[in-house]
Amino acid sequence: MRTHYCGHLNREHIGQTVTLCGWAHRRRDHGGVIFIDLRDREGMAQIVIDPDTPEAFKIAESVRNEFVLKVVCKVRARPEGTVNLNIPTGEVEMLASEIEILNPSLTPPFMLDDDNLSEMVRLEHRYIDLRRPAMQKNLMLRYRVAKVLRDQLDSQGFIEVETPMLTRSTPEGARDYLVPSRVHHGQFFALPQSPQLFKQLLMVSGFDRYFQITKCFRDEDLRADRQPEFTQVDIETSFLNEEEIMTIVEGMIRTMFKQVQDIDLPNPFPRISFAEAMNRYGSDKPDMRVTLEITELTDVMKDVDFKVFAGAANSAGGRVAAIRVPNGAALSRSEIDAYTEFVKIYGAKGLAYIKVNDASKLNEEGLQSPIVKNIHEPALKAIIERTGAQSGDIVFFGADKAKIVNEALGALRTKIGHEKGHVDGRAWAPLWVVDFPMFEHDEENDRWVALHHPFTSPKDGHEDLLASNPGAALSKAYDMVLNGWEVGGGSVRIHKQEVQSKVFDALKISKEEAQEKFGFLLDALQYGAPPHGGLAFGLDRLVTLMAGAESIRDVIAFPKTQRAQCLMTKAPNEVDEKQLRELHIRVRQQNPAA
C-alpha cells in the first residue's frame, strides 16, 4: 500500500515517485495551493497539492485533521527560504498526484500538539494520545531498551523461560490480586508479584541462567512511579556470587545505555553500604547528583537545653542530624515554612534551622534562630565544624526516631538540591547499594520482617545472628540506583533448607505456615539446589528515566490511573450475576453508614 515512511524521505529521494500512508496532522490553504502535513510513526512529510491535479485538489479540500490518507507523490526540493532543518524531512516536499481518503475522522477531543492537556482526558482517549510524537517516541524507546537487554542476555547464555501467571497466594508484602477458581469451589489463584520462587526452582532444575521480561502485579497504593501491573526484566543465575552477578548486570546496563542513547555510564559503578547511604543521604536510593549531605549530631546534643534535640539524642533509636545548604540564609520565611510542611509528610513534627550570618560568632549575634539560646557553645561549634557551614548558609535539623529523621532529611536533601541548584551537573549517577540488613523491625506488630524478601541469603558469618540478633544480620542483597530511583534489586538466595528455616524462625513463620506456603520450595532445596542469585529490573522505571518522562504512565501504552482504573475501557467493572454464580461469589454491598 505504501513505499516509504513519511519520516524517512530526504534529499536522496528527490525525483522519485513514492506512496505514503498516514494521518493528516495539519491542513493549510495558501493562495490556491493546499499543504497537508502527513504523519506516521516515523515522522512528518509536507504534501503539496496544487490545482493542476484537480481531482486530488478537490479531495484535499475536504481533508480534516486525523483523516487517514494514501498519497501518491513526487519528491522535490523545497523552494529556497522554506527549508526547515529542525525536522529530518525539512529539505524536501512531496507534490501529490493522487490522494485517497482511507478513512475520515471525527474532530479529535484534543489537538496532538496541545501541551496543557489533562492527563485524565489523555487516558480516556489513549488511542488518540498515543498518536502524539512524544508518546510514540517513548514507546519506541521502550522497545529498543527491551530488545537490547534481551540480546545482551541471550549473548551471555541466558535462556528465556516463561513462568505461570496463575499461581498461589503467598501474601508477604503487598496485597495479591486474586483470581477465583470456577472448578475449585472457594479457592483462588493469585497473579504473581514476581516470579521469585519459580526462577529459584528453575535454578534447582539446572537451567543455570534464566531471564524473562514479564508482567507482575501488586495491589498497593499507587504513586507516580507505581502501577498495579508493571513489567520486570527478571534474571537468575547459578554458581555465581554477588560480585559476579553485579558485574554481569552492570555491564549489560552500560552497554544498553551506549547502544540505545549513546550515553557512557561510569565503569565501574560506585558502591556504598546501606548504612552509609542512610547516614549520609537519608535514603537507600540516594540521588548522587545532589551535593548536599546529612551530618550526624546525635552525640553532641545529649546535654543541650533544647528538649527536642536532647530528647531524640538520649532515646533508644533516636537521631539528631543536619543538612547544610550553601547560601541558604537568603531563604525567605515562606520558603522555610514550605519546607517545614514538606518534611511533615515523612512524619517530622517540624523543621528547626539556624541561619549562619557570621560563622565566627557562636552566639545569637552570628547565628539566627530561636533555638540558638538553648544550645551550648560546644554543640554550636560542632554544628558549624561538622557541617562545614560558612557565613550565608542555613542549617536544617531533624530530631526524632532515626527512621523519621532519615526519611524527612533525605527527601528534603533531594528537594532543596534540585530546587536550589545544589547538583554536580552529571546527567546520570548510577550507584550500587550493598550490605543491606536482613530484617527491619515492625514496631506495630513487634516482629522482624524481611527487608527484601525471606529468600535472601545472609552474608557469610552472619547466619548465627539470625537467631541471636536478627537486627544485626546483613544480607547478600544489592540494589542498583540511578538518579535517586531504584531501578533494580537482587540478592544471592538461600540454597540450603536449614538456613531457610532459620530465616522463617526469625520472621516468626511457624513450621506449619512455612510448609503450607512454601513447602514446594523447602522440598526442592533438599534435592541438590545449587548456589544461586539474581536480580530484577523495573523496565517501566528504567525507560521513564531514559525518556525524561514525568511518570511511568508516559512510557506504558495503556496504563492505569493512580486509582488503579483504566479510563478508556472503564476497568474494573461490574460483571454479570451469572458469572459470579459460576465462581461461587456473592458481592456484599457496602453500607455507606458503616
From Swiss-Prot:
Binding site for ATP: 218-220, 227, 486, 538-541
Protein name listed in UniProt: Aspartate--tRNA(Asp/Asn) ligase
GO molecular function ontology, one term from the record: aspartate-tRNA ligase activity
EC number: 6.1.1.23
Region (Aspartate): 196-199
Top-rank taxon, per record: Bacteria
Encoding gene, per UniProt annotation: aspS
Single Gene Ontology BP annotation: aspartyl-tRNA aminoacylation
Location of the protein in the cell: Cytoplasm
Keywords, comma-separated and alphabetical: Aminoacyl-tRNA synthetase, ATP-binding, Cytoplasm, Ligase, Nucleotide-binding, Protein biosynthesis
Site feature location: Important for tRNA non-discrimination: 30, 81
Binding site for L-aspartate: 172, 218, 452, 493
Chain's role: Aspartyl-tRNA synthetase with relaxed tRNA specificity since it is able to aspartylate not only its cognate tRNA(Asp) but also tRNA(Asn). Reaction proceeds in two steps: L-aspartate is first activated by ATP to form Asp-AMP and then transferred to the acceptor end of tRNA(Asp/Asn).
Organism field: Methylobacillus flagellatus (strain ATCC 51484 / DSM 6875 / VKM B-1610 / KT)
Lineage: Bacteria, Pseudomonadati, Pseudomonadota, Betaproteobacteria, Nitrosomonadales
Major enzyme class: ligase
Assembly and oligomerization: Homodimer.
Primary residence: cytoplasm
Family: Belongs to the class-II aminoacyl-tRNA synthetase family. Type 1 subfamily.
InterPro entries in the record: Aa-tRNA-synt_II, aa-tRNA-synth_II, aa-tRNA-synth_II/BPL/LPL, Asp-tRNA-ligase_1, Asp-tRNA-ligase_1_N, Asp/Asn-tRNA-synth_IIb, AspRS_core, GAD-like_sf
